[in-house]
Amino acid sequence: MEKKWALVTGASSGIGLAYAEELASRGYQLVIVSNEEQAIREKGEFLSEKYGIEVLPLYRDLAIPGAAKELYDTCQEKNIPIEVLVNNAGMFFFCETLQAKANIVEKMLYLHVTTPTQLCYYFGQEMKKRRHGYILNMSSLSCWLPYPGITLYASTKRYLKSFSRGLRSELLDYGVSVTVLCPGAVATNLYNLSNNLKTLAIRLGIMMRPEKLAKKGINALFHHRASLLPGLFNKICTPLVMLLPHGLVRWIMRTTKLVKLDR
């Protein structure tokens, strides 16, 4: 029986690691990618021992030109046919766009726009030829909320949502299913919250555990869902927040001093 392979980016911790574990539990061999060299090697050993699968851990910076082609070429050289591509790698910062450092802006654009697009392009071509494959792109609930402080982040995630929906239409007739996931807050180290606050947020339904999100995401992918906004709290609150006038949002941001806004 031919081995099934999945590729997960940003897989050294958090949601990416949860995706890797979920796919490993379903019998997939793994290519896992991260810009944290020691962590990705350790996670590779951990996953291989726990699930009895073959794991190729790759130390790569996906926020630079040519990263996607290099990753694709590595899989080709090692004769690894990717059946499942999970574009999970990402970054987050909270500040006014023009206050961010230029290199950080460029890094986010590569990580959220250029590299995932190119990975879909290269691996999508192989899937199209085989007439079988799955692509899961990670957008965000914030793609509907381009507010001060997260303007660039929300906009790049909006791109991923739109790109995924269009690519899905192009590939469905070739047996390739593209799903976009738009999660809200997830209990990872991204927000620098204490464990007690994370636990409270999970109980209130404001946050979701990465393992739960990964299971929902992979289930949606294999059920050929176009998109998924997981969590009852997110489904209820997102439409309400979208109704807020931008003038009110600016006033809240200015009053709370979350970001510095010019009058």
What are the functions of these language-model segments?
Residues 26-42:
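Conserved glycine-rich Rossmann-like NAD(P)H-binding loop of the short-chain dehydrogenase/reductase
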Residues 170-232:
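SDR active-site lid
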Residues 120, 156:
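Active-site helix of classical SDR
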Residues 5, 10-13:
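Conserved glycine-rich cofactor-binding loop
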Residues 140:
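Residue(s) in the substrate-gating loop at a strand-loop-helix junction
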Residues 96-97, 101-109:
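Substrate-binding pocket helix/loop in short-chain dehydrogenase/reductase
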Residues 88-93:
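Conserved NAD(P)H cofactor-binding loop of Rossmann-fold oxidoreductase domains
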